[in-house]
């Protein structure tokens, strides 16, 4: 595996770890702290998603992650968060 491939893989792995960290953070927040309708929940979610999107954009600009892969990562996280939100509000 070339150095560039290793860098690309490491960048994508790190972005996935960050996405998983956000999902975990929101799960903990919903389970223990606040309701999805709480402004604090929305603020944390918006801030975390904005930060991850900036990470993805940066990795794409450096050529470490394909633009479409970055979009798919964000879509996957948004879908998982949406499912989590639905499950929490339908309980």
UniProtKB/Swiss-Prot annotation:
InterPro entries: UPF0358 (IPR009983), UPF0358_sf (IPR036270)
Pfam families for the chain: DUF1507
NCBIfam families to which the protein is assigned, alphabetical: PRK13666.1
Family indicated by similarity: Belongs to the UPF0358 family.
Protein name: UPF0358 protein SERP0701
